[in-house]
Swiss-Prot record:
Residues 335-415 bind DNA. Transcriptional activator that binds to DNA sequences containing the consensus pentanucleotide 5'-CGGA[AT]-3'. Required for olfactory dopaminergic neuron differentiation; may directly activate expression of tyrosine hydroxylase (TH). This is ETS translocation variant 1. GO terms for biological process: axon guidance; mechanosensory behavior; muscle organ development; positive regulation of DNA-templated transcription. The lineage of its organism: Eukaryota, Metazoa, Chordata, Craniata, Vertebrata. Pfam families: Ets, ETS_PEA3_N. GO terms for cellular component: nucleus. Residues 128-179 are annotated as: Disordered. Keywords: Activator, DNA-binding, Isopeptide bond, Nucleus, Phosphoprotein, Transcription, Transcription regulation, Ubl conjugation. It comes from Mus musculus. There is a cross-link at residue 317 (Glycyl lysine isopeptide (Lys-Gly) (interchain with G-Cter in SUMO2)). Its main location: nucleus. The modification Phosphoserine is found at residues 94, 191, 216. Abundant in kidney. Moderate levels seen in the heart, brain, lung, embryo and lower levels seen in spleen, intestine, testis and thymus. Sumoylated.
Length: 477
């Protein structure tokens, strides 16, 4: 009995298994063929549509491949920085109800192949059919505003690749009726940069319009540009109006421009020059305008007088003892040597070291070193001597102002007309106030080394004390 059951049981089981296999084999074959046929049909339809529609979209948009790689990352970067949970209008997908059903049927297929980005996009494709079908068609001006109007409580269910989705809307604005091709282009795009989402701050930013760069990065380009160039202000305000919600964060950069400071600076510069020109003509009350016009060229030499506003009005008359020449004529800083010589010749008190010879415009330096010394006092050059003065006079030979009289020492003459000479030397009929020896001593106490003064003063007592000694010993000692 045991052996029979041992032999009979496999036989019975074999018959039952054989009969069961015979009945189930056609069913399994039919299922496998049906699955393979559906799989091949779905995959062929999917990839064929992807390739065809992607080529169609690229042909219509005419966007290079490098631009396609960078556009979605930049919007994802801006959304990552601003952290706005937004839901964007998706009108091109709303008329395609077949696409949503196809995406819902393709979810198991896509998930089995590990296309997480495709699965997320298909999940996104279903949502605009439920909540955003009655929205208006997109326009270039309404696309940036759409995050404000479509922020809803169900935005938390939006997957993360959807945040990178609005990056395609501005570049695709040139395609009015591209409803289905945009989906596949986005699907292919979103399947690529999902792995590179963390290092987004290093991605390029070429494919973005200017107004969305301003919306996504308001604090980087605009404070320095708005601070210096005020003509960017209307463009900036226009972009903030287009930006909608992003315009609420822009008033602080607008306050950085500090327009009152710029206008105050612009108004200070001409006012400083105008005050300077008025103090040039301080003593020339009847013809103040002529005095200003005469010194337009050399006016830049003493522009630092603008830093001392308390000396514009009353202190100019007390400045003969200072370094600058003080009154209207010398304040310009243009007192030349020939003008200085004319001023010395015009004063009869200086006739003991310089005087007219009486032969036209000839004059003689009776004491040339004294003339050189006074010129050094006038220009604050204590080392001035006649050699340096004569070299300066040679410059006027070439200019045709004066000449050296041949055969006579220290005799010169002016070659121009006397009236023209005095009109140029004394504009506005104002004589320059020349510095004296007392002023020179006051200046030397503060600024000039006293070597020359010490030699002249210490030599006399030494000469009186050293009379019994030989001159050489006393001089060396």
């Amino acid at each position: 009995m045991d052996g029979f059951y041992d032999q009979q049981v496999p036989y019975v089981v074999t018959n039952s298994q054989r009969g069961r296999n015979c009945t189930e084999k056609p069913t399994n074959v039919r299922k496998r063929k049906f699955i393979n046929r559906d799989l091949a049909h779905d995959s062929e339809e999917l990839f064929q549509d992807l390739s065809q529609l992607q080529e169609t979209w690229l042909a219509e948009a005419q966007v290079p491949d490098n631009d396609e790689q960078f556009v979605p990352d930049y919007q994802a970067e801006s959304l990552a920085f601003h952290g706005l949970p937004l839901k964007i209008k998706k009108e091109p997908h709303s008329p395609c109800s077949e696409l949503g059903s196809a995406c819902s049927q393709e979810q198991p297929f896509k998930f089995s192949y590990g296309e997480k980005c495709l699965y997320n996009v298909s999940a996104y494709d279903q949502k605009p059919q439920v909540g955003m079908r009655p929205s208006n068609p997109p326009t270039p001006s309404s696309t940036p505003v759409s995050p404000l109007h479509h922020a809803s409580p169900n935005t938390a269910h939006t997957p993360k690749p959807d945040r990178a989705f609005p990056a395609h809307l501005p570049p695709s604005q040139s395609i009015p009726d591209s409803t289905y091709p945009m989906d596949h282009r986005f699907r292919r795009q979103l399947s690529e940069p999902c792995n590179s989402f963390p290092p987004l701050p290093t991605m390029p930013r070429e494919g973005r319009p200017m107004y969305q760069r301003q919306m996504s990065e308001p604090n980087i380009p605009f404070p320095p540009q708005g601070f210096k160039q005020e003509y960017h202000d209307p463009v900036y305000e226009h972009t903030t109006m287009v930006g909608g919600a992003a315009s609420q964060s822009f008033p602080p950069p607008l306050m950085i421009k500090q327009e009152p400071r710029d206008f105050a600076y612009d108004s200070e510069v001409p006012s400083c020059h105008s005050i300077y020109m008025r103090q040039e003509g301080f003593l020339a009350h009847p013809s103040r305008t002529e005095g200003c016009m005469f010194e337009k060229g050399p006016r830049q030499f003493y522009d630092d007088t603008c830093v001392v506003p308390e000396k514009f009005d009353g202190d100019i008359k007390q400045e003969p003892g200072m370094y600058r020449e003080g009154p209207t004529y010398q304040r310009r800083g243009s007192l030349q040597l020939w003008q200085f010589l004319v001023a010395l010749l015009d004063d009869p008190s200086n006739s003991h070291f310089i005087a007219w010879t009486g032969r036209g415009m000839e004059f003689k330096l009776i004491e040339p070193e004294e003339v050189a010394r006074r010129w050094g006092i006038q220009k604050n050059r204590p080392a001035m001597n006649y050699d340096k003065l004569s070299r300066s006079l040679r410059y006027y030979y070439e200019k045709g102002i004066m000449q050296k009289v041949a055969g006579e020492r220290y005799v010169y003459k002016f070659v121009c007309d006397p009236e023209a000479l005095f009109s140029m030397a004394f504009p506005d009929n104002q004589r320059p106030l020349l510095k004296t020896d007392m002023e020179r001593h006051i200046n030397e106490e503060d600024t000039v080394p006293l070597s020359h003064f010490d030699e002249s003063m210490t030599y006399m007592p030494e000469g009186g004390c050293c009379n019994p000694h030989p001159y050489n010993e006393g001089y060396v000692y």
